[in-house]
UniProtKB/Swiss-Prot annotation:
GO terms for biological process: translation. One of its GO terms (molecular function) is structural constituent of ribosome. Part of the 50S ribosomal subunit. Contacts protein L32. It holds the Pfam family Ribosomal_L17. This is Large ribosomal subunit protein bL17. The keyword Protein biosynthesis does not apply. GO terms for cellular component: cytosolic large ribosomal subunit. NCBIfam families: L17. Belongs to the bacterial ribosomal protein bL17 family. Keywords: Ribonucleoprotein, Ribosomal protein. It comes from Streptococcus pneumoniae serotype 2 (strain D39 / NCTC 7466).
Length: 128
């Protein structure tokens, strides 16, 4: 089997992976269990590779997976308006150009101490 079940149905698992992938793209570092970190590494690597391609088809493929969440919001005093950047825009404009010279290996998993409640192995996954 090429993936972990993570104790969920396929729809729940896909939703969780989409959420965690989007959170990692927005925050660039998240704390999760070790098994989840190893699973979202695959999806994040694919999304960054799509971002590096940068064409319309790659953008649409990434948009089909990444959640439509606001990554940052800035206030422009000149126009008296807020401008927001979505996770997809951040992927294509900030994250992908950063890895233009790197072929894969965009994430790093750091193991941390076990979770207090159930002693699940925890890890920090971050963009390199």
């Amino acid at each position: 089997m090429a993936y972990r079940k993570l104790g969920r149905t396929s729809s729940q698992r896909k939703a969780m992976l989409r959420d965690l992938t989007t959170d990692l793209l927005i925050n660039e570092s998240i704390v999760t269990t070790e098994a989840r970190a190893k699973e979202i590494r695959k999806t994040v690597e694919k999304m960054i590779t799509l971002g590096k391609r940068g064409d319309l088809h790659a953008r649409r493929q990434a948009a089909a997976f990444v959640r439509n969440e606001i990554a940052s919001e800035n206030y422009d005093e000149a126009t008296d308006k807020y401008t927001s950047t979505t996770a997809l825009q951040k992927l294509f404009s900030e994250i992908a150009p950063r890895y233009a010279e790197r072929n894969g290996g965009y994430t790093r998993i750091l193991k941390t101490e076990p979770r207090r409640g159930d002693a699940a192995p925890m890890a920090i996954i971050e963009l390199v």
